Structure formats: structure tokens, C-alpha cells
Amino acid sequence: MSSATSPIILKWDPKSLEIRTLTVESLLEPLVTQVTTLVNTSNKGPSGKKKGRSKKAHVLAASVEQATQNFLEKGEQIAKESQDLKDELISAVEDVRKQGETMRIASSEFADDPCSSVKRGTMVRAARALLSAVTRLLILADMADVMRLLTHLKIVEEALEMVKNATNEQDLAHRFKEFGKEMVKLNYVAARRQQELKDPHCRDEMAAARGALKKNATMLYTASQAFLRHSDVAATRANRDYVFKQVQEAIAGISNAAQATSPTDEKQAHTGIGELAAALNEFDNKIILDPLTFSEARFRPSLEERLESIISGAALMADSSCTRDDRRERIVAECNSVRQALQDLLSEYMNNCRYGTWMDESSKSGRKEKGDPLNIAIDKMTKKTRDLRRQLRKAVMDHISDSFLETNVPLLVLIEAAKSGNEKEVKEYAQVFREHANKLVEVANLACSISNNEEGVKLVRMAATQIDSLCPQVINAALTLAARPQSKVAQDNMDVFKDQWEKQVRVLTEAVDDITSVDDFLSVSENHILEDVNKCVIALQEGDVDTLDRTAGAIRGRAARVIHIINAEMENYEAGVYTEKVLETTKLLSETVMPRFAEQVEVAIEALSTNIPQPFEENEFIDASRLVYDGVRDIRKAVLMIRTPEELEDDSDFEQEDYDVRSRTSVQTEDDQLIAGQSARAIMAQLPQEEKAKIAEQVEIFHQEKSKLDAEVAKWDDSGNDIIVLAKQMCMIMMEMTDFTRGKGPLKNTSDVINAAKKIAEAGSRMDKLARAVADQCPDSACKQDLLAYLQRIALYCHQLNICSKVKAEVQNLGGELIVSGTGVQSTFTTFYEVAGDVIAGGRDSQLSLDLLPSCTEGSLFGSGSRDSTMLDSATSLIQAAKNLMNAVVLTVKASYVASTKYQKVYGTAAVNSPVVSWKMKAPEKKPLVKREKPEEYQTRVRRGSQKKHISPVQALSEFKAMDSF
């Protein structure tokens, strides 16, 4: 089979001058450059200077003539070889020859007299005509290539029809072999065309069509063979017709992409970001208005209508079957908050119009002041929409975590039923499989709805469409196998559709993972594993073997998915300390924690499954379950180590949520102290906004000190320098303590805060020991005294931090009323002032004075005020103590280094590295190979290619067309 008999229709206007391939563009570019240079040789009017000949112009004219001659030779060769566009190509070659001759004469005359505007105008018109003629010749040559591709497509279509019309298996094998040969040829030609296409969307369409053709061609033979062998089974015809349709659509896709025709409506539906994400983006843009021109009648209805549309979409997500009750409540609460924030914002706009308060004398340029009420209202509105986005993302991630768990189980159950030949059972499991497939598609579309990743959304929607169309055919293959369970052909057909389904589900899973945040995934997975751990413990205590087995399986599946996704994520980063730490946590979970958990599950199920339940160590199971949760949490902590504070802020609600849930579960520890059913951290999170604002001010000051410490320790390599290691440890613990005052972080109760303070004191003691050793070796007495003075500060502030944490422990709740145990607090402060006095008396007066006394004074900590004010005072005292300690650590690190340099200067190069610690500059941090892109950056992303100022031949050609003749 070598040629097609029916005519080939080219969906391309030969008169069009649209350049569609990179080859045509690259061939045309030199000629455009030469002509442009020639025309611009003299762009000035008549001159009073003596006229003369321009050697450069003559050289350029000759180069244009030579380039035209090359086009003529190539064009004549293509015209001789072409079968379909021979006449058009010959005509185009003659036109180029004619326009080339005109251009040669005009350019020669212009080169002789470059100052003549008339001759210049004549040459411009000739150049325009020549470029148009050459462009048309190249496009016709490009069309000839497309015609050759379409000829191959026609041959493949005929071969496909021959396969479809095969009457027996032997005939099918022969015809399919011929079809395979033509497929190889077509794939080669299509791949070349794909590389040539200029439009990236057309290249994507070509790649997708080629992939679909290759994928379905492998299914074509088994589906056709099953139909020929079992033509009496209706499902076999459905399988065969489906595969043929897919192959035909792939061939049509190659044809459309090769000709760069407009995509179908279905493909256009796949483009664009998520509907809900787009609506939120547009709403965020619309709320920023010019206050001086604000009109309530004009803007209020529009903004309210947009918001209600967004809330309707959020409500649909909240009402979905897989949305958890607590998540639904949060979405509803955020919707109400957004509504209220919009009303507050509109009120501020009206107030500004009424009273003109938006601009003051110092900002008449129109710039909003930071503390302006309108600016605050806009920020609040933006924050509320961001909070709503976060809850919607978490809701979608809830769905993904549940639906994309053990995705192959419904399929395996269906196949096992089919192998047994039980058609009734197959139909029952087919319904389960269909519901599972529908759920995957639904969840994928939900993920798309809130994603700003346009390319990722397109891939997810295309993969979901494939899942939707493939699902009935998998069921048909199962029905065929159920009808003929002993048939090898039916089994092979089932295996092919099974493999195709699993591949497509993997594609969909990876596509969904690409448009969702790893941080959101870890946050939700951690929460779900905690829920499952609690269910396991309850099932264990109640002796419910089925629930225990099923839930333990879910835990294993969730943990395996966490490990897989994080390992894949780390491949995007260059190997370094960060990736090593993350991979260590995943390795620990997969190789140590999960095997132990599986072993304990097996022991528990075996003990409970006997007629007489056997006793076993319940605490061992609980510990193994707890380790799974802790392992996932450690992975999440390791992943978040390089996140910015802004990125970590999005996880703030979950930080509060998971620990509070944990404190009320069956795996809570003995030190989980609760006040009226709430942890101390939860109580801190419920403080009034005014109190939170005051705490936030203190935290901001603390962060300033922290940034100083970060800058200092970032200079040094901590290998061989325990002072830097201890400084980092103290910084991390102090961050956790300040997070506690805001109702966040891992510290949950007052006992946790006390333990954290003890750890800081221990680290401070170790730092004191090391730094004193450095001071002892320092020959410079001034540096030595400075270092010792800073060490005294550390001792003082560690003691102060201990006191502030212990004072919080004296706060108890009796009968719902917050009181403070005065005895404990008084004794604590008595001890403190004695120690503080000794420290200050022993230090240098220039370094330490009475102003270093702790900020957590007696009056601020005794419960004379309300519960909220008491909590506020203790919180601010804790933050101030941490800030003071942070500052002392910074000064100690600096002084230790200075003291070490003095030691080196005195004792020479033999002591470059101190016996106590080694001061080595830290190597530059390694950057990820692939930049992590925030979802909101996809809209505003600028591609590198667009930054280059490159004028395409088409643009230059259009400039010639726009030039006026002289």
C-alpha cells in the first residue's frame, strides 16, 4: 500500500501569508535583514553635499540578488518534486524571479544615487513586493510538506479501515502488520512537523495526538481479536469501536495540528485557569477602586454580585459528599467573613467620598497612607479572600487525599469477579468502579476550579476526559471476560485495558499533584493520618477487626503516597543539606516506622480474629501508630524548612487544628494539660483582636532580633562549630515559644513551654562553657571581658525566660475562673531577683545595668486583671525575654569570633582553627534546579523568550507594507 486514492483536502488558504513554521521564518529572516539594511542605508532627505556612489549599498544589493537566486533554485527543485502544488509553486517561482529582477534594478539605481527620495521609494516598493513573493514561495513549500504528511495520514486511515474490515484472526494479523508499518512512517513525518511548528499550542496538540495514536494502536489488535473471536458478546464490539474511534480522532488531531487550524470546542474548553480561581482573582482586582470617583450605585451591586457568585461556587464545594463537617463549617465561616469585609470596605469607600479622608496634605499625589482606614479595609478584604482560598484548597485536598488513595482497588475487585465468570457480581462491582471513576473526575475538576496554573489545568482536564471515556470500556472488557472466563483472548483484552486504565490514572494523579501545593498536601495528609490513627485505636479497643484492618490500610496508603510525592518533589532540587534532611525523614518512615506499624497491625488483627480474643500489648500498637503520625509530621517540618514566613502563614489554621484534635483523642499523652477542654495554646489563639495586635507588635520586634541572628549564623559553617549549632537551636526553640503566644506552633501547653525554657537553659549552659573556653584562650583582655559580659547576659536572660514560662504554669482554671497562684509566682521572683542581682554585680558596668532586669515584672504577672489581660501580660513578657536572649546570643557569637581572631594573631598560623570551635565561612547555598512557582505567579509569569527584543520577519514585512511611497 503506497498511495491514497481519495483526494486530500488542505485546510489552508494558499493566498495566506501567515508563517506557521520555524523553518520558513529562519529562511526568510536573512533576506529581511539584508533588505532592511539596504533600505536604511540612507534615511535622510536630499543633501547639499556632492553626490557619489555608495560601495556599501552596492554590496548589499548584490547580497539581496544572490539570496533571491538561492530561493529561485530551491523553489524550482521543490516544484519539480511536488505532486499536489506543482502549478502553484511554479507560479510562485516565476513571481519571485520577476520581483527579484525589479528589485535588482531598483537597488542598483538607489545605490548609485542614495540621496534620491524617488529612487529610494521605488526600491522600497520593489523590496515589499519581493518579500511578499518570497514569503508566498516559502509558505507554498511548507504546504507541500503538509501535503506529504496528509498523504501519509490518508494511507494510515485506509490501513485502519482494512484492519476494521478483517474477517478472521489470520487476516487481522496480516492487515495489522501493514498498519504498523504505515504507523512508523507517519510517526516519523509527524515528529518532524511537530518540531517545525511555530505555535506552541499546535506543537502540544501534535504531541498529544501522536501519543494518543501510539497508545490506542497497542489496544487495537487485542480489541479487534476479541471481537472476531467472541462476536456474539456485545461488549467486544463496544471495545473495538471505542479504540477505532480513538485512533481516528488521533489522526484528525495530527491533521489539524499540522495545518495549525483552530482547536475544537472541546479542546477550547480545556484551556484557561480554574473558574473559581479566576473569579477570585478578578474580584481581588475589582475591589481596588479610585476613592475619588467611587459611586455606590455603580460599584456596590457589581461587587456584591461577583462575591455571591464566588460564594455559590464555594458552597457547592462545601456541600460535596467528601467535604468534612469541620471543613464545611470553616468554608461557611470564611464566606460570611468575606461578605462582612466587603460591606466594611464599601462603607470605607463611601466615607472617603463623603468626607474626603483618603488623601491628606502629605499625600496629595494619591498614595494611600499605611494607616489609612481605607487601606486597612482593602488589606482586610484581601486577607479574607486569601483565607477563603486557603479553606477551599484544603477542602479540595481533603477530596484528593481520600479519592486518590488506593485507586487500583475497585479495578482489581472488578477483574477478580470477571475471572470467576460471575456476571451478576461483575455488574455490581462495575457500578462501584464507575462511581470511583466519576469521583476521580469530579475531584480533578474541583482541583482545577481553584488552580491558577493554566497549563496544569489543561493537562488535568484532558486526563480526566480520558478517564471518563475509558471507564465504560474497562467495564466492557470485564463483561467480555466474565462471559468467556476461559478465553485467552478475552484475558489479554482485559489486561490491555487494565494497563491502559492504570497508566491513565497515574497520569491524572501526577497532573493533579502538579496543580496542588505540596504544603497543602502534607498538611491535610497529616490531619487525615491523625484521624485514621484515632479510628484504629478506637477499633482496637472495641475489637472491630474489619474497621481496624480497613483503616490501617488507609494509613499505609496515605503514608506511601506522602513518601512518593515528597521523594518526587526532592528531585526538583539540587542535592544538598535540605534534600538530605527531607529524604532522611522519608526513609525513616518507609524503612523503619511503617514496617513496625504493619507488624503491630498484623499482631492486633491476629489476636482479635480468634474465637477467644488473645491478649496483646495495646500500648505497642498505639506507640507504632503514634510514630506514623510523628513520621509524617517530621517530613512536613523538614519540607517547610526553606519556606518564607509568608508561605508558612497559609498553614496557620492547621497548626492550631491538629494539636487541639490530638489532645482530645485516645492517643493523648499524660502531659496534655487542658483548661475547660482546651489547650493553653488554643486559649492564646482566642484572645481578643486588640490583645493579639499587642502581641504581634512584640513578635515583630522579636523577628527583627531573629533576623540579626540569622544573618550572623548564616555566615558560618556549623560543622565543627558548636557555638553556631547551639545558637540555631536556641533560635528555633525561642521561635516556638513566641509562636505559642500567638496560638500557633508545636508547643501546646504550659508544660511544653517550661520544657522549652529548660532546653534553652541547657543550650545556654553549653554555649557558656564553649565561649568561656574561647575567652580563656583569648590574649586580648578587652575582647575577653566583652565576651564574658555577654555570657552573663545569656545566663540572666535564660533565667528570665525560665521564670516567664514557670509563671504561666502557675495559672490554673478553677470553676471557669482564671486565677494565679501567688505563692509560686512570688517565690519564683524572689529567686530571680537574687540571681539577677548577683549577675549584674559581677558584670562590667558598661555592659550590664539595671535596665536589663526582666520585663516580666511582678505586677504584670499577678492576676489582678482579667483573664485576657493576664494572658497578654505573660505572653508579652515571654516574647520580650526571648528577644533579649536572642540579642545576647548574637553578641556572643560575634564576640566569640573576634576573640578567636585575636588568638590567631598572637599564636600564628598554627592556630587558624581554634581547638574549641572552627570558624569557617559557609559555602553558598544550593538552589533548586527547578524554581518552585507559586500558584498566583502563573498569571503574571514572563517567559524568558519574550524578554528578548527580536523582530520577526513577519513584523518586518508588515513594516514595509505600512511604509508610504515617495
UniProtKB/Swiss-Prot annotation:
Residues 924-952 are annotated as: Disordered. Residues 924-940 have a biased composition (Basic and acidic residues). Gene3D superfamilies: 6.10.250.2510, Alpha-catenin/vinculin-like (1.20.120.230). InterPro entries: Alpha-catenin/vinculin-like_sf, Alpha_catenin, Vinculin/catenin, Vinculin_CS. Disulfide bonds: none annotated. GO terms for biological process: axonogenesis; brain morphogenesis; cell migration; cell-cell adhesion; dendrite morphogenesis; regulation of synapse structural plasticity. Residues 941-951 have a biased composition (Basic residues). GO terms for molecular function: actin filament binding; beta-catenin binding; cadherin binding; structural molecule activity. It comes from the Eukaryota. Belongs to the vinculin/alpha-catenin family. One of its GO terms (cellular component) is adherens junction. Pfam families: Vinculin. Keywords: Cell adhesion, Cell junction, Cell membrane, Cell projection, Cytoplasm, Cytoskeleton, Developmental protein, Differentiation, Membrane, Nucleus. It is found in: Cell membrane; Cytoplasm; Cytoplasm, Cytoskeleton; Cell junction, Adherens junction. May function as a linker between cadherin adhesion receptors and the cytoskeleton to regulate cell-cell adhesion and differentiation in the nervous system. It is a peripheral membrane protein. Its main location: membrane. This is Catenin alpha-2.
